[in-house]
Amino acid sequence: MKTIKPEEINPQPVEFNGAYIPGVTIRWLIKKEDGAERFAMRYFELEKGAVIPEHQHEWEHEIFILQGKVLITEGSEERVVEKGSAVFIRPNLPHSYKNIGDEKVLMLCLIPYLKG
């Protein structure tokens, strides 16, 4: 069994198209090296106004908002999501995230490991 708190892991910058995204960090809480063969659990922090630009890939996301208010787009759909909400992002659809609140957004994001 592994137990860990996010603050026990150093935050890493998030890279997008060869550059770091300002105001966004990630902490890999649970990953393959921990014995998790099917899913990874990640902890994101988005500072006020920070944006994870539109992107897409072949895996889904399962997200839980721990703090803050975030505008999430998936394809042509936009939703404002707040603390205590779960979100499912479908695979192969463009999606993005923007902190539109007055505080930092904290969110858990699970992704599957795809068989290659």
Can you name each region flagged by the protein language model?
Residues 59-61, 65-70:
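Glycine- and acidic-residue-biased ligand/ion/polar-headgroup-sensing regions
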Residues 40-41, 108:
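Anionic, Ser/Thr-rich low-complexity intrinsically disordered regions
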Residues 77-91:
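Short acidic-glycine-tyrosine-enriched beta hairpin
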Residues 91-116:
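Ligand-binding loop in jelly-roll beta-barrel domains
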Residues 50-52, 68-73:
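Short beta-strand segments in beta-sandwich/barrel cores
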Residues 42-57, 91:
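Conserved short histidine dyad/triad with adjacent acidic residue
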Residues 1-38:
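A short, N-terminal "cap"/entry segment at the start of jelly-roll beta-barrel domains
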